């Protein structure tokens, strides 16, 4: 499988993914996942896509949302196309049955996922988190996501995301 853009894509290599991602992929029966090293200074989506020749619509962002109700905090990961924005205060807040929902603080997201900020991916997240995927992501043939590290990316068939634990496909998760 050839990856998008002008990157040197190779089969997933342990040194190019965060430890929780490598562990999750060790149990995943997919052979068509690719990784590519990138300049960590270009990990943010717009800069990454422009520099490496990737269409924004072929890139998906994973954000960690914290929903709170009283003293209870629930987390979810949301995967949406880079051309859209997550509906945090509508769809996600209702799904988490929370009074308030917001992007998780950076330190919390990093500590809870074991991944680098700016590289968080839906692969290898805590088992009790829902992974909310906007249906538009699945309409892509191939999608580029984080690797858990800022210095690399993963490319995979979008439909492979359906194999993730805790995945829920949601229409209108993003707009």
Question: What do the PLM-derived regions correspond to, one by one?
Answer:
Residues 1-175:
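Extended, low-hydrophobicity, polar/charged segments
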